[in-house]
């Protein structure tokens, strides 16, 4: 199963660059504060997504070989172009993996307590200076000069699109069919 569906080098590298792990960034307006739970109360926390076997069995996942949906280098695609709405409209039938170049990025709401764009995920930076970029604890608040490349799955792309205003060029998009876990992988669970 795995040999038949392995990624090519380009889609594998895009997957590695898009992966971000858990979202653990705290509220930037509560930095250096100790938040106490009132006496007699319990702190509340839910992390259902970490119940991995349950998630694997209950929800569709991206499977199969990646399909090149869009590439800016291909002349026939350049004519039609590609935008974020089009990519997001592919979900839930398809999972997407997108490489995009971003310019002039800023939070839609300056009071956003947990900005999503990680400075560490800003690859191939071009003409970005400290005066042209505003960040807080490793999260991008605004970029007024220069550009960068980032890699997003469809969930990350949706969050970036909701939290930020920005100009962009879609460079490449791979899609994967979302489906239930194949029986050969589900049986051991």
Where are these regions (language model features)?
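Conserved acidic
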Residues: 1-189
């Amino acid at each position: 199963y795995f040999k038949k569906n392995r990624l090519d080098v380009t889609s594998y590298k895009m997957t590695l660059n898009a992966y971000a792990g858990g979202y653990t960034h705290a509220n930037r307006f509560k930095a250096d504060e100790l938040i106490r739970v009132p006496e007699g109360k319990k702190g509340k926390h839910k992390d259902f997504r970490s119940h991995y076997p349950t998630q694997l069995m209950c929800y569709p996942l991206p499977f199969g070989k990646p399909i090149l949906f869009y590439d800016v280098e291909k002349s026939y695609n350049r004519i039609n172009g590609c935008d974020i709405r089009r990519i997001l409209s592919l979900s839930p039938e398809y999972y997407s993996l997108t490489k995009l170049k971003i310019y002039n990025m800023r939070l839609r709401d300056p009071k956003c307590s947990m900005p999503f764009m990680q400075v560490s995920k800003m690859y191939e930076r071009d003409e970005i200076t400290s005066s042209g970029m505003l960040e807080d604890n490793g999260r991008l608040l605004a970029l007024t000069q220069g550009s960068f490349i980032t890699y997003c799955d469809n969930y990350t792309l949706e969050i970036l699109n909701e939290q930020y205003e920005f100009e962009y060029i879609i460079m490449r998009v791979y899609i994967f069919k979302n489906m239930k876990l194949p029986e050969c992988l589900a049986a051991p669970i």
